[in-house]
Amino acid sequence: ILPFEKPFYEEYNVDAHYVGHPLLDEMTKLKPVNRKVFLKQNKLDPKKEIIALLPGSRKQEVSRMLDIMLKTIKLYPDYQFVIACAPSLPEEFYKSIVGEENVHLLFNKTYQLLQLASAALVTSGTATLETALLYVPEVVCYKGNAISYHIAKKLIKVKYICLVNLIM
């Protein structure tokens, strides 16, 4: 459960406790990344800072969010943009969205990428917590469809969409 959910359970005489998040343990096991080696292996420019793009892990979510995130590239030409790709989605899927944009695709290297990123654009979800635990400044993004938004607005009573704001 999340910290703010405890009163809900108490109302129904359920003894519930927030015990933390398993990511906290996972992050303590991370090994530092050798910047020079990582940049060379992944053909990244050592002279440019990295902005990580984490558009989500589900096909529909990535389709909806990545296009919006890519619009920032033209605003910050002095940075290099790197997408942390979901291993469950094929490279061709990302390439069909990215087109000719000057952006790099990385699979299975999200934590290493975040360790070297100066900032990140992150779709709301677990990735926001991972990004925060690695001390990377982030902009949290989400775009739902209009019907879902209006239903959620009536039902959900939290101020934030970001796990970082809900947990930390």
Predicted region positions:
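Nucleotide-activated sugar donor-binding and catalytic core shared by glycosyltransferases
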Residues: 1-168
